[in-house]
Amino acid sequence: MRRTRVRLTKQSLVDRAVENGVKPFTALAGLLSLALRSYLGKDEIQYSYSADTRREAGVPDALYNCVCSFQSGVKLNEDTRLADIVPEMDAEVLRTLQPEAKLRQMAQQMSWVYKVDRQKAPLRIKQRVFQMGEYISGVPADFWLSYLGNPLLPATPELQKYTKDFNVWVPPDGGSMGVEASSLNGIITLCIENKAEMPGLAGMIRTAFEKEDITVLEAVDLDT
């Protein structure tokens, strides 16, 4: 497992998002897709993201996990720029994050988890069955992107710790990379856990981001 850390200014990401009329989350997903085209050597990148469904389920303060996951993809070529792909990506994200869509997706995914858990089988068998469900449902992707922390509470100990600690997140079965984005003091930190064997991810992310005028403060492969 390779680890990569990238730090960029939040304002530069917000500026690119505003220029293209999309959310910063979508701009970040688009930037990562451009970088991974070079890194993975693929012209179509699949990405997944999760959404909190506690509010839609009527339990906004619940302490347990209450999420649903979505997957989408983007086709790229060597001339593709961020502005070419993010409008459609943003429309897809907004469509999936409607309350009805989130509840429907959560119900489908959690019903599968419940059915697997009810099986009278060893844990290793349940894990394999659950992995099969991930493949069947289309959840595996080239990268998973998620956000940690409440941006209105930027100084929480959990968030401060995570900018230095990768042990919270690993890629799911079928996913090449897990990307956790945290925002603290105007800096977005990407902690990336990568199953792919090729070196050089940090440099390719820096190149792709800076080509789109993102201010990259750090891009380093930690396991070289």
Residue positions per predicted region:
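Flexible, P/S/T/G-rich "lid" or insertion loops adjacent to the active sites of thioester-utilizing
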Residues: 1-22
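Generic structural signal for individual residues within well-ordered alpha-helical segments
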Residues: 14, 28-29, 86
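Short amphipathic alpha-helical segments
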Residues: 24-33
